[in-house]
């Protein structure tokens, strides 16, 4: 991936992490995890639920839904700065 392309997944996860926006993570098996994104890498996301952390593999995630809207303009501007 070239530097000029926006990595939307990383920008989205980083935005909800930095702004401490609660998310609902829907897994492919139907389970839902409601908590805060604490970190992520290429393969996993760390979600904090009730002061406990869960490591979730990205291939098990179908959807990440923030509890409040995030600005897509902020995501694009931050990605363009890289």
Swiss-Prot record:
- InterPro entries, per the entry: Hfq, LSM_dom_sf, Sm
Gene3D superfamilies attached to this UniProt entry:
2.30.30.100
Asked whether the UniProt record includes Repressor among its keywords, one would answer: no
Q: Which UniProt keywords apply?
A: RNA-binding, Stress response
Q: Tell me its family.
A: Belongs to the Hfq family.
The family database entries (PANTHER family) matched by this protein are listed as: RNA-BINDING PROTEIN HFQ
The protein's name in its UniProt record: RNA-binding protein Hfq
Q: Which GO terms describe its molecular function?
A: RNA binding
SUPFAM superfamilies named among the record's database cross-references: Sm-like ribonucleoproteins
| NCBIfam families referenced in this protein's UniProt entry, alphabetically | Hfq, PRK00395.1
Tell me the domain of life. Answer: Bacteria
Q: Does the keyword Oxidoreductase apply?
A: no
Provenance organism: Syntrophomonas wolfei subsp. wolfei (strain DSM 2245B / Goettingen)
What the protein does?
Answer: RNA chaperone that binds small regulatory RNA (sRNAs) and mRNAs to facilitate mRNA translational regulation in response to envelope stress, environmental stress and changes in metabolite concentrations. Also binds with high specificity to tRNAs.
| Sm domain sequence ranges | 10-70
A GO cellular component annotation here is: cytosol
Q: How does it assemble?
A: Homohexamer.
The Gene Ontology biological process annotation of the record reads: regulation of DNA-templated transcription; regulation of RNA stability; regulation of translation, ncRNA-mediated
- Report the CDD domains cross-referenced here: Hfq (cd01716)
